[in-house]
């Protein structure tokens, strides 16, 4: 119902995007509206909606919250790529590169002393605590580490939120104009070997050249491809939706599940499990 109302015209979408982005914690809805309009009409016709979403988000930036504006811009970029190229994998790689550039430019670096935020991160994540302890023992500056970790985590959150907004926008578009199209498209998401090679090169280059954000976010497209693989297999097998609930519960709460999904996405790039499964069925 909401998507149908938004698609009645650009003024409706612009009003919805502006209102959603203005309300605290509803920036994701404004970003999804901007993405939906971009997917449907293209970047130039969608500019009024993008501006309507960006103005309140810019105000939030002036108040110290960069996440809404970064999310609106990032999801719009990915929507443009997805509309033009019709490949989720390319949109994800483009989004990861853009988010890495934002981190490298210091957009997500918090002002002032970051040590208190770093201590909160350490208390909330034993993995981060061990990693930082190891780096500190090697002589790295705590303040620099704090800024890198906090900006990196913020950039990761923005990237994942933007991917979620793009998925929401694509599902709206499919629901209005191509029922079932989003499910089919997402279930088929898989990185091509050349795209995997690009991610590997970017990750290695990031480590060698000291561009940490490339190494920090380069794995995200592979993670989404692994998630799509799980969705696709469950769909092909006609399994109960509770399997997806259990899968996401494990994905959110346990690091080993993330590593397994990454490995599955990596192997699927070469083996194409869904094509083999479809033939066997």
Regions found by a protein language model. Name each.
Residues 57-61, 68-110:
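Short helix-perturbing small/polar motifs within transmembrane alpha-helices
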Residues 29-35, 68-76, 212-223, 259-269:
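Hydrophobic core segments of alpha-helical transmembrane domains in multi-pass membrane proteins
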């Amino acid at each position: 119902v909401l998507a149908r109302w938004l698609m009645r015209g650009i003024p409706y979408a612009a009003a919805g995007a502006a209102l959603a982005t203005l309300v605290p914690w509803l920036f994701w809805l404004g970003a999804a509206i901007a993405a939906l309009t971009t997917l449907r009409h293209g970047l130039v016709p969608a500019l009024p909606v993008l501006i309507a979403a960006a103005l309140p988000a810019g105000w939030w930036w002036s108040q110290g919250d960069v996440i809404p504006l970064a999310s609106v811009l990032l999801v719009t970029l990915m929507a443009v790529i997805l509309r033009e190229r019709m490949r989720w994998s390319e949109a994800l790689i483009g989004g990861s590169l853009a988010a890495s550039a934002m981190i490298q430019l210091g957009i997500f670096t918090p002002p002032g002393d970051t040590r208190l935020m770093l201590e909160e991160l350490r208390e909330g994540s034993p993995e981060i605590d061990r990693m930082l302890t190891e780096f500190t023992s090697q002589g790295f500056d705590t303040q620099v580490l704090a800024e890198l970790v906090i900006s990196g985590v913020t950039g990761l959150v923005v990237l994942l939120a933007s991917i979620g907004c793009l998925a929401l926008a694509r599902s709206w578009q499919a629901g209005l104009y191509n029922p079932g199209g989003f499910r089919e498209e997402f279930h088929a998401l898989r990185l091509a070997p050349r795209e995997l090679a690009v991610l590997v090169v970017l990750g290695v280059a990031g480590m060698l050249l000291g561009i940490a954000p490339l190494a920090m976010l380069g794995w995200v497209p592979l993670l989404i491809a692994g998630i799509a693989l799980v969705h696709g297999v469950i769909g092909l097998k006609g399994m109960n939706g509770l399997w997806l609930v259990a899968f996401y519960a494990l994905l959110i709460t346990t690091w080993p599940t993330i590593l397994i999904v990454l490995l599955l996405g990596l192997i699927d790039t070469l083996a194409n499990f869904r094509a083999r499964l479809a033939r066997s069925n």
